[in-house]
Every structure is written in C-alpha cells, then in structure tokens.
C-alpha cells in the first residue's frame, strides 16, 4: 500500500511559522516558512489541489497572554481566527494542540533555543532561517516543524 500523507504545523503569531512534511512513499519532503497570511493561503491551495483527503494539520492552541494590551490581544485573536477560517474553507482537517502537549512529547520547555536545536537534530537539512539574508534561526519555524512532526507521529499512532 502506498503511503502518501501531508502534515502541516502552524505556529500562529507575528513571529510564527508554517511547516509542511510530505511523506511520499519512501521519500520525505520538508519545507518551512515564516508565517504570513499569504503563505498560509498559498500552501493550503496547493495542498488541497494535489492531496485532497490526506492532510492533517496541527495548530498550536493559544490563549490570552498576560500583560498583553487589548489591541494586541484583539489582533492576535483575529489572526488566529483567520488561520482556522482558511483551514476550514479549504476543508483541511486540523487539531488544536496545546504547547504543553506537543512540547512534552519532545521533552521541551519554554526555551525557544531548545526548540530550534531539537528541530535541527530531527531535520538537519532543513533551514530555519526566515530569509537568505537572516542570520538568526526562527523559533516559530522550528516550532511549526516540530508540530508537523507531532502530527505525523500522531497520525502514525506513535503518540
């Protein structure tokens, strides 16, 4: 039986990320992106055109953040709703997973550098740089990649 699945991880927010893991029988294609609304729409359109019912997405379940202003909270909630709306509109199944759950699976805490190191260990050939000109790796891209891997393991029954 051929195994063809796509796993999408989304770390919402201004410095968030998107990651796609495509299992193509014996090969695997992995891509990461800094988060943007346009990138999300483009990826979802591409995936639904080619993959239909073989997509699983994990979106980090977020709540209000202490000491965040009213406007910031509203804008973040609006962006979060946008992500869920795009997924729903494209009929992409998703699960909201708390950061504690997926981070516990990878033995991580709130240290963003540990997320980057774990992503680099699991996917050494994948760039976590938002652009070619950046020198600092993106923790949002690293965490979205770990969420996509969490989705892959969840789908495979290893969690």
Q: Model-derived features: where do they sit?
A:
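Phosphate- and other anionic-substrate recognition elements at nucleic-acid/protein interfaces
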Residues: 1-159
